[in-house]
């Protein structure tokens, strides 16, 4: 199965900083393109105001990902961004259900289901995030939590045109990374329960030093990269090492 790397910038980088990133990334990519696997897919999810800048990259393989979308199609929903708007920009992927949105913005299963439906309506590939807390991990509840999170939306998700991103909450932005063995076990469990052809990627303190061991695992199809994707050279090195 092809590998995919998606950089999630969260609420970082202004428009001018995004332009600077793209210029530097393009240079790195051109200098190192021969070291990057031809079948590797990769994308960046910047803030909404910088989405259109990704398409300006000279690296034509670089796809656009969005960090969120509205559960509504259109109308009087101040501040929302619709799936149709994202599609019109040429967006390929959209992150749904990230733990930060579940925890901080109190997004619930019904809203996540509606977002998945909107994404699929406009031919966007949902990157559906699942993950357990440190307490749940230490209590041995990882499998129960992950299966429950996916079961909550499986009635609307087209698994053949979606990505499941396993991001243990205890490893997001903490510098702690689930060992490759732990990540492989959970990603393998997801495939066993929801289809061996399901694309499953890992996220949680991924960087250029640990990416190779992670994507070398049988059940890990790529990575959702946070902080390490903010540096153009580091993101490029992640692609080289994938």
Swiss-Prot record:
Principal cellular location given in the protein's record: cytoplasm
Keyword Isomerase: yes
Active site: 98, 167
Gene Ontology molecular function, alphabetical: triose-phosphate isomerase activity
Chain residues that bind substrate: 8-10, 173, 205, 226-227
Record SUPFAM superfamilies: Triosephosphate isomerase (TIM)
A cellular component term, taken from the record's GO annotations: cytosol
Record keyword Cytoplasm present: yes
Enzyme class at the top of the EC tree: isomerase
The EC number(s) this enzyme carries: 5.3.1.1
CDD domains: TIM (cd00311)
Pathway listed: Carbohydrate biosynthesis; gluconeogenesis; Carbohydrate degradation; glycolysis; D-glyceraldehyde 3-phosphate from glycerone phosphate: step 1/1
Keyword vocabulary terms for this entry: Cytoplasm, Gluconeogenesis, Glycolysis, Isomerase
Subcellular location: Cytoplasm
Cross-referenced Gene3D superfamilies: Aldolase class I
Catalytic activity: D-glyceraldehyde 3-phosphate = dihydroxyacetone phosphate
Function: Involved in the gluconeogenesis. Catalyzes stereospecifically the conversion of dihydroxyacetone phosphate (DHAP) to D-glyceraldehyde-3-phosphate (G3P).
Subunit structure: Homodimer.
Sequence similarity: Belongs to the triosephosphate isomerase family.
Stated name of the protein: Triosephosphate isomerase
Organism annotation: Mesomycoplasma hyopneumoniae (strain 7448) (Mycoplasma hyopneumoniae)
